[in-house]
Amino acid sequence: MTRSRAVLFDFDGTLADTAPDLAAAVNRMRRQHGQEPLPIERLRPFASAGARGLVHAAFGVKPEDPEYKALREAFLDFYAERVCHETRLFPGIDTLLAELRSRDIRWGIVTNKSTRFTEAICFSLKLKPDCLACGDTTPHLKPHPASLLHAAEQLELPPASCCYLGDDLRDMTAARAAGMRPIAVDWGYHHPDSGAPGTWNAETILAHPLDLIPHL
């Protein structure tokens, strides 16, 4: 097995728990429409799917529906106002990042989230990744491997020397297509359409961030 020279992370549900702020934005919309807010535990599984997932969870509206565009824009406007109010790193992530630094292993973020939101959260949480590839960095979103390959190019490393951590089937699909080591995490959001992590054909499933260390 090739030694990992870089660890790349999905963002929402893998590196950071962004669900509280995402849920707050969509519940603000529900109140505006005269509806009761939904409990965060009902919305959490859809957080990794961003606006598309949360608008559908809160209003039953899909991207092909005529009202979707307006709802999506309202959601993004509300989210932009409080993008990192309650967002935090998952427990153990800060310790893992420090361990990677001590081993001279580089790390980065590859996410379908837009650059403006990702950079704002990184600034608030004082994160300084070695590379960043967002949903608007390449023409394709995960599960297409383009953003993962872009990150490897930024690091000037072969994809095979990188592992990619994620909490969704699309993350593992993208990692395999990019030629990276696919590593699933058990602490994320796990969209109901993705099935259980054990069905994703990941190299391993981590119960805690520090469980990655023996696999480096």
How should each PLM-predicted stretch be described?
Residues E36, R106, R181:
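Residue-level detector of anion-binding/catalytic polar loops
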Residues D17-T18, A47, I109-V110, G166, ...:
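Small/polar loops that bind or transfer phosphate-bearing groups
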Residues M1-R5, E41, R101, T115-L216:
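Asp-based, Mg2+/Mn2+-dependent phosphohydrolase catalytic module
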Residues T2-T95, R103, S114-R116, K128:
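N-terminal helical cap/lid subdomain that shapes the substrate entry/recognition surface
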Residues A98:
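Anionic-ligand binding patches
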